[in-house]
């Protein structure tokens, strides 16, 4: 199961994790140097008081706390993996700050780097899409004309991440496969403004993509990794080392979070999977991530494998 490890923002010996897929609704601190553990958040009784069938509390593998590690956004499931609610939790004060009943189970949730917003992302649900809620789920969002407690960031749930722009503001970075150019874009969580960064539908091709915005100490940059590219004329055929392969395919690169962004290639992510691997083929995706000051990058590859 997924323990969702999250490193302490300043102590490299400490991380936080949830039990197997959030069962038990606790958050534990682990010192990897001493192997000492302590429960820093036992949310079970409180969550059951809101939702009697509550059984798990997690981000569903794709979320993170605020950049300072204080604020957490968690989705709550029952023992049948049906979503019942979302909460925000203050680790410093061990206090529930807000909660919301769920109209449908999200694909994942995450706290924004600033700790001001809980981003809830629903897959295959254009009405709900991906939304940035105010931390208590009741205060109207400043960018909502209808005085709702959220702004809609996207009509889909795509591979995405939350990052900080150069001004230190929260942004949502994702790809829009429904756009004419398959744009990679960002949305400012405070203003709701969307900015296109670069197209991905190049010369009849498309690519799968991941983002990491975890370089909070280097605001204004995100990490991008691509894989699984294809041409519209033959989606089953690899473009590797052909004239149809484009500049971004099979790459790890940094992108500045601004209009007309800088693109800085970092590495080749020459990774392919085999159908015989079954579900393990998922781990052939590069899924690149970056450290807090953008001096280290980690990614998967099957090159020469």
Predicted features and spans:
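Blade-terminus and WD-like Trp-Asp/Gly-His loop motifs, strongest in beta-propeller folds
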Residues: 3-15, 51-72, 108-120, 153-174, ...
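Acidic, serine/threonine- and glycine-rich low-complexity intrinsically disordered segments
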Residues: 98-208
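Blade-level signature of beta-propeller repeat domains, shared across WD40, Kelch, NHL, RCC1
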Residues: 281-305
